[in-house]
Amino acid sequence: IVPKEDEDISIELEKQFKNQGIEFATSAKISKVIHGKELSIEYMVEGKNEVFNCEKVLLGVGVQPNSDDIGLENLGIKTYGPGFIEVDEYMKTNINGIYAVGDINGKLPLAHVAFDQGVVAAETIAGENVEGIDDYSNMPKCTYCQPQIASIGLSEKEAREKGLSIK
């Protein structure tokens, strides 16, 4: 349920949520929400149609850039993936004088990261000698839930993919 965290953290969080009466359908595609005497959702998971009666629905879709129809293509600004704006370590786009900070650049969608990116962009614009951000692996991350989750550095999976040994 938290795919960017270590698997054991995700397993424990799901266990804690289930103890609170929360049920999950991950990788599900919701087709309909029905507001009747009860709240129900129709969804498909693993090729099967399901119906679930519930009190509330939380749909976690991740981060998607809101870059459609804002004219990026008219300016020739390079994007990648679902519409994230390509930037260098100083938050510069491929067009001189245009910068992109925060979720729109797809680097690490967290408020404190966007703040730091904004500082780098502003100081670069002001002509200051600034250190750019080219490594996001040691930025602290957190998930606001109960129990709380926080991490820094590589996940176990990322470390293994880099050929590092872990304990």
Map each language-model feature to its residues.
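General small-molecule cofactor/ligand-binding pocket signal
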Residues: 23-25, 52, 167
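Cytosolic Rossmann-like ligand/nucleotide-binding regulatory domains
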Residues: 160-167
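FAD-site-proximal beta/loop scaffold in flavoenzymes
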Residues: 51-128
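Rossmann-like dinucleotide-binding cores of NAD(P)H-dependent redox enzymes
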Residues: 1-48, 109-115, 123-158
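Short phosphate-binding/catalytic loops that engage adenosine nucleotides
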Residues: 22, 77, 164
